[in-house]
Amino acid sequence: VSEYAGNFNDVIWEGTRDTWVAVGAAGSIFTAVGVKSDAYFSRFSNTVQDLNSVVYAQNEFVAVGNGGAVIASNDGNIWSPKQSNTNYNLNDIIYDGNRFITVGDNGTIGVSSDKNYWQPWSQQQYNNAVHPATFDFRNLKYIDGIYIGISTTGNLYYSFDLINWNSRVVSHPNSIKDLVATNFGPSQGRRVIAVGSGTTAFYADPVINRATATASVTAGVITSVTINDGGFGYDVGSSPPVIVAPDKT
């Protein structure tokens, strides 16, 4: 049983490995085998930086932390450092189905297809951004094709490309700490639940946040698009991409 007295910042359960992995202060990593296990064992992480988040994908555990720390392990027991190409604190890491994405302070975003080589996405793409991330990331989520960032001050932002970020105002005074997509709710069995300070808890159903628009067509060509309701995805006045399917006979 662990006698660790420090802080854990993240913990995950990986069913295919039947393993718990917890990460925390000063490079602390503890693992346990079995979903009901109460015996956690310390592992050498190869870093003294605080570890803030851990994810499992591509048959690997990957953890990130302060000072740009990135470490990886295929079993949770033996960890090796990776080069993140940043010195900013990394506060969260996700896998969006195609690549690892880590986010942190000063709008830092890093991407990797294999967890070994990390591309400093935010710095490299900055010149192409109309609304770059200028906030400190606390968390990053990927839900229904949308990247959702939560800042360290509890504000909500969204992006389709990790380059341009827009603020999403919510009608709640307390800061948001985290959110999760669930498989229940009135709209196609989906509901996003957010939690935050002061026992904050609220939810959104995708149908409420769906953008609607009216297109003008001349001689079979779309000449303009008017946003009627920006929903979650667009600000009124922005120019969203339009995909037109061929006519069906």
Describe the residue ranges of each PLM region.
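Residue-level hotspots at or immediately adjacent to binding/recognition sites across diverse folds
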Residues: 1-207
